[in-house]
Amino acid sequence: KSGFQMYVKYDAEDFGADAEAGYPSLLSAQKIRDGRIKYMDLNGDRKKECILVTEDYINLFTMKGNKVKYLGGIHISYMDGVTHKGKAKEFTFFRYGGRMMHYYTFRIKNAILTKVCTFGDQVMDASDGSLYNEYYYNDKRTSTKKYKSTYRRYATGGKELSLG
């Protein structure tokens, strides 16, 4: 009747330390019924994880026999997506927010979801009215070189997963 309490471990709205702590988010039975379920191998171990895509979150579960373990939920919006590289152990969520692009790379190992890194770029206004890019890696400004190598490692060459 009242739904169940789903604990969100990662919230892509927030880069800070609180994002890892997460907060309880009530997922109603209606949202669960309306949600779309996908089965994908996100970590290259040849076992498919269960992804419940509800209105605001992608919720990840592992299944072993008849046991189901909730790994976490990641906040999504319309322009977001997920890429995955075949045998790679990581998968990357990307979020587009106006002039900002954020990437969140996760790994699932032994049924535990951990954040590998976050990186992104942001278009800024210079004092002379021109535009320039600022790059970030794990919440800190970084060089163009570091950003490009991280981008190549995690965000290119993978296939985009359809969550619809």
What does each of the following model-derived ranges do?
Residues 42-53, 86-94:
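Acidic/hydrophobic-patterned starts of short beta strands in beta-sheet-rich repeat architectures
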Residues 1-5, 93-164:
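Acidic, small-residue rich beta-repeat scaffolds with periodic aromatic anchors
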Residues 52-53, 62, 83-85, 107:
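Well-ordered beta-strand positions
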Residues 69-92:
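Long amphipathic alpha-helical scaffold regions
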Residues 1-43, 150-164:
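Terminal domain-start segments
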Residues 58-72, 106-110:
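Beta-propeller blade repeat segments, especially FG-GAP/WD-type strand-to-loop junctions
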Residues 47, 55-58, 77-78, 98-103:
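Short, surface-exposed coil-to-beta transition loops
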Residues 35, 76-84, 125-129:
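Repeated scaffold domains used in trafficking and secretory/extracellular systems
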